[in-house]
Regions:
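Short glycine/serine/threonine/alanine-rich loop segments
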Residues: 25, 66, 97
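Substrate-binding/active-site groove segments that recognize
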Residues: 47-68, 83-87, 104
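Catalytic and substrate-binding regions of cell-wall glycan-acting enzymes that process beta-1,4-linked
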Residues: 93, 97-124
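Cell-wall glycan
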Residues: 13, 54-55, 60, 110, ...
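A short, structured beta-strand-centered segment in the mid-to-C-terminal lobe
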Residues: 69-80
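Export/targeting segments at the very N-terminus of extracytoplasmic proteins
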Residues: 1-40, 78-79, 85
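Secretory-pathway/luminal and periplasmic proteins that interact with or process carbohydrate-rich
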Residues: 38-45, 63, 91, 110-119
Length: 124
């Protein structure tokens, strides 16, 4: 990784920590989640059409529910991280503060967690 990419990644990690802290999320949990989702690549596209740092599906962004506002631009690191943090917090709150279920719902959807279903695309 070049020095420029390394610096950009560290800047994005710091931004993720700040956004998480402002929402009362564990900053390291959020950083680990974003690292797992995209490796802090704001241009990452997932196989199912997920976009950006938090690997958000456009359909989730269009109608997130749970009082979460849609992001303007999922490729914009700030917009994506803010949406991702808000959505993660909403999922955690939806499951009564249960971090494990909240993170699972972030990845698979609240309905799938309620049904105990883990989609094949998220099993690895």
């Amino acid at each position: 990784m070049s020095q420029t990419n390394s610096k950009r990644t560290e800047d994005l990690r710091n931004l993720a920590r700040t956004i998480a802290e402002k929402r009362g999320l564990d900053p390291e949990l959020f950083v680990r989640l974003i690292n797992q989702e995209s490796g802090f690549d704001p241009n990452r596209r997932g196989a199912a059409g997920e976009i950006g740092l938090g690997q958000i599906l456009p359909t989730t962004n269009a109608d997130p529910g749970f009082g979460v506002r849609s992001a303007n631009d999922l490729f914009d690191p700030v917009d994506n991280l803010v949406f991702s943090a808000n959505y993660l917090l909403a999922m955690i709150n939806n499951f009564g503060g249960d971090l494990e279920k909240g993170v699972a719902a972030y990845n698979t959807g609240a309905g799938n967690v309620e049904k105990g279903i883990i989609p094949k695309s998220t099993q690895n």
